[in-house]
Amino acid sequence: MYASEHAAELVVARSLNPVLPSLKTVRRVGPDYRKGRDITGEELCATFGLCGVEYGEWLPDKERQESLNSCFDAFCDLADVLKVERTAIGFHGLLAVAFGSRGVSNALAHFEPLRFVFNLTRMKGAGSVAHEWFHAFDYFMGARKEGIKLDRRDPDLYMKTKDVVAITEQLFNDDPFADLVSGLKGHYLFGEEAKQWLIEKREGIFSRYLLAADDFVRALSEGCCCPVTADQRQRATALVDHLSSWVHDSDLYKRDTDELTRLFSDAMGWSVYRFSVSNACSRLLCIAREYLKAIESEKKNDQKVCVGRSKYYIESMLIDLGRCKPYWSKTLELAARAFGAYVERRLEADGRLSQFLVHSHKNECYSDANPYPEGDELDYIENLFDSLFSSVSI
């Protein structure tokens, strides 16, 4: 829907790489959990269940202390947003944090799933904590889904993490993570809007069916190699009329599509007929099946329906156009950025600010790209994250 309505804008290929804005000062508004005192690395690990803290060789002592204090505040804020125990933030002794070390290329922050550590680069890593933490959560839950127990004390941890696939990259159904992935990539309508869209879709398909039915009857009259008996013509016409009447059948969605095939087979009493007849018959059958599917969807999904790709997903694919392989539109990156936007919105709703944890996760902060969900899509994604974290334990 979004793509069709904004086709003219989306034609232009863009080679973009939106970068999180650097902050001169990192601000925070919220409870003073430290009571103004400095935090040690040992205290950070004990409070949040981290296995360790690593510092870059060239990180000055003052900056090291600022990083510890800011990270402590950020993790407290994150635990508040997620409503989890603080030790769950470090996955009970699994996660390590590095400040100004283990950097990768030009990344502001980077999570290493093989070692279960994320690095915040010197000066520029502020605002990436929520994003990188979700990557860790993604792999942690992926391991759990696959039955792989990750334990920092396990000498085979490195080999085990090599086999882990992020849970947002796995294929499964009827799961809060599956709902999240669908919500990230799909554009949904709800309530009366959903009902009306489904009705209009069904009516449009039925209009196409009537046209296909006319083509089928015409092909019977004009395209047969062998004479068509009056009985065959009568049965074929009756079949078309019968299918057309299904629009008034309240139990239509229960009909099996195999019944359609059988009805057509019974009607086709002759063995040799031109391609035009076969083609018209196949088209009619295909549209009839599509109509059945629309009816079934209308019965099952009258409160929610996916009508196409989300604006968030489309914009992410546009950013990837100039890249040799997808990055922004990868599922795990869509999820991590959306999580950052979710955390930022949750903090704002409570009158709080935590820029070391997350900042600038709004499209208005970027002049030529839209890397984050917004509006109604963010509203829906926010509810999905709420459902997710209320249904899983860390």
Tell where the protein language model's regions lie, with residue ranges.
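Divalent metal-coordination and catalytic microenvironments
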Residues: L78
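Active-site-flanking segments in enzyme catalytic domains
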Residues: M1-E63, E85-I394
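A short, highly charged nucleic-acid-interacting micro-segment common to nuclease
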Residues: L59-D73
